[in-house]
Structures are given as structure tokens and as C-alpha cells.
UniProtKB/Swiss-Prot annotation:
This is Interleukin-12 subunit beta. Residues 1-22 form the signal peptide. It is found in: Secreted. Glycans are attached at residues 134, 152. Residues 237-327 form the Fibronectin type-III domain. Disulfide bonds join 50-90.
Length: 327
């Protein structure tokens, strides 16, 4: 990951004395130092270069200390703790010449830290969940965090690795929804992405990769999710759920339609449906699976009929339920 993301800035060069090259540019003037988090680790030696053609009269300071750290166009620092990260500024007299921010990415015993995000379900390995309503190449990813302040997320995505194809993602936004896990409330962030040259009918051979960069104060982490669109399909619920009496007492004919967001033509992108009847005592009847958009069921007063949809030809996720009370 480090070598793939390394960007060398010829204007304001930041490099590492270590041959591991464990520093890279996250965005302009923001750098991530990848650090072994162990008491015996000597730390990483980093050389910062001031963005100026001048050579003399330059001093360096940081937000962690009010003292002058050094003078000259370059400053060598040893990064070992979070106290060594933060903003570094070079000045000449009272003029700020350039400023850069160092973030730390912790590696403990060969495992990168994952402290910022929270799993909704312990058995789920992914901290980032992605879903698509259809095969248009548009999908939504979301994640949870308990952190309220000083947290920022950015998202990038592509399909394939050797010759990556473009996927455009918007800005991560905070949802009004709050999720409770083990009596604790978590905030939910989400992002919308669109494959640039999606072909809904084409067979997928290369997965899409989504990378979420997370920054909390001076800590950096990243989270990667890789998938095929067919694996993350979750249709919207069926629409226009209706009932009409049948000739047989206490039976009704239930009808519905494909959701508007589902791919067309429906003869090619077909759905299958699950139908359940819930009585007053909230006991489920046997589940009915049908491919058509109607079914006749026994429906006593006070019961509820629910219908959900799934891709007919691929074992992806079921939609949420569409529900209607029996007359």
C-alpha cells in the first residue's frame, strides 16, 4: 500500500532515511508516517524541506512546542509518538514560508490499527459495508464510528489493479441515523460512488475496490472493501403492494410491482420474491417463494402480508420488506 500511494512532491520534498520509505502524501502538505508501534522501536527519521528558494534565515517550529526546533532549509526529526506528529512550520522572520502536517499510521505486531471504525456485527469482517440497488454501477458504502469530533473521511475507488478503471465517489456525509450496538450509540457515515463506464449487462471479471481514509486528530487509518457489484446487490422493496378479495373466504390476492430503481428490462434483470403472512400473535406462516408479482394467501383480519425481493439468478441480499395489513 505504501509504495502504491507514495507521491513525491518536487516543491516541498519529504523523505525518509529508512529504506522502507514509510512516509507518503495523503493530500497536499499532509503526510502519513507508517510506524511500528512498539516500545523498543527506534522511530522513523524524517527530513522536512521548506518550500522556498532561500537558504538563510529560516527557522522551524511545531504546534507541539513553542521552541525553535532548528534552522536552515531542512529539518530532521525523529517520529516515534503522537507527540512527534502534527503541524510543522518554516518561517523567515515573521513570514510563514510553508507548513505541513504529519499523521501517524500505527502498526502493532504486523497489524494496522482499526480504532476509528466499529463493526455493526462481530462476525462481519468488513468495517465498510457497500450496497447497490441495481446493476447501473452506482453503489453506496457506509460505516460506523463512536467518534464525534476531529474525525474526517475521504473515499477513493477503482475497478481492477493492473489497469484500474475509474470509479467516482462523492464526499462522505454524516447520516441522521444513529445505530446502537451493545447499548452504545454510533454515528453512521455514507458515500455515493458511480463506476465511470459501467455496463450493466457485462460479466464482471475484476472487482471494485473502495478505500476509506480516516483521520482522527493525528491518527490515520484506512479501510478497504473489495467486491463485485453482483455481490452487493440489494433491491429496493417491491412497490404498490395491493390486496383484493378472492372467491375463497379469508383469502386475498396480493399483487405488487418491481421497484422503480431496479434495472431494466425486467425480462433480463428478473427478481424473485418472498411472501410471508404474520398473524395477530406475530407468528410467521410458511414462507412462499414466487417469481411472478402476485400470489393468493390466507389473510385473516389483523394479520399482515410482507413481500421482499432479490435477484432471481444470483444469491445476493434480500430487499427490506413491503408490508400491508389484511382487510
Amino acid at each position: 500500500m505504501c509504495l502504491q500511494q507514495l507521491v513525491i512532491s518536487w516543491v516541498s520534498l519529504v523523505w525518509l532515511a529508512s529504506p522502507l520509505l514509510a512516509i507518503w502524501e495523503l493530500e497536499k502538505n499532509v503526510y502519513v508516517v507508517e510506524l511500528d508501534w512498539h516500545p523498543d522501536t527506534p522511530g522513523e527519521k524524517v527530513v522536512l524541506t521548506c518550500d522556498t528558494p532561500e537558504e538563510d534565515g529560516i527557522t522551524w517550529t511545531s504546534e507541539q512546542s513553542s521552541e525553535v526546533l532548528g534552522s536552515g532549509k531542512t529539518l530532521t526529526i525523529l517520529v516515534k509518538e503522537f507527540e512527534d506528529a502534527g503541524h510543522y512550520t518554516c518561517r523567515r522572520g515573521g513570514e510563514v514560508l510553508s507548513q505541513m502536517l504529519l499523521l501517524l499510521h500505527k502498526n502493532e505486531d504486523g497489524i494496522w490499527s482499526t480504532d476509528i471504525l466499529k463493526k455493526k456485527e462481530p462476525e462481519n469482517k468488513n468495517l465498510v459495508t457497500c450496497e447497490a440497488k441495481n446493476y447501473s454501477g452506482r453503489f453506496t458504502c457506509w460505516w460506523l464510528t463512536a467518534i464525534s469530533t476531529d474525525v474526517n473521511f475521504s473515499v477513493k475507488s477503482h475497478r481492477g489493479s493492473s489497469d484500474p478503471q475509474g470509479v467516482t465517489c462523492g464526499e462522505a456525509t454524516l447520516s441522521a441515523e444513529r445505530v446502537k450496538i451493545e447499548q452504545r450509540e454510533y454515528k453512521k457515515y455514507s458515500v455515493q460512488c458511480q463506476e465511470d463506464n459501467a455496463c450493466p449487462t457485462a460479466e464482471e471479471t475484476l472487482p471494485i475496490t473502495v478505500v476509506v481514509d480516516a483521520v482522527h486528530k493525528l491518527k490515520y487509518e484506512n479501510y478497504i472493501s473489495s467486491f463485485f457489484i453482483r455481490d452487493i446487490i440489494k433491491p429496493d422493496p417491491p412497490k404498490n403492494l395491493k390486496m383484493k378479495p378472492s372467491k375463497t373466504p379469508q383469502q386475498v390476492e396480493v399483487t405488487w410491482e418491481y421497484p422503480d430503481s431496479w434495472s431494466t428490462p425486467h425480462s433480463y434483470f428478473s427478481l424473485t420474491f418472498s411472501v410471508q403472512v404474520q398473524g395477530k400473535k406475530k407468528k410467521r406462516s410458511n414462507t412462499l417463494h414466487v417469481d411472478k408479482t402476485s400470489v393468493t394467501v390466507t389473510c385473516q383480519k389483523g394479520a399482515k402480508v410482507s413481500v421482499q425481493a432479490r435477484d432471481r439468478y444470483y444469491n445476493s441480499s434480500w430487499s427490506e420488506w413491503a408490508t400491508m395489513s389484511c382487510p
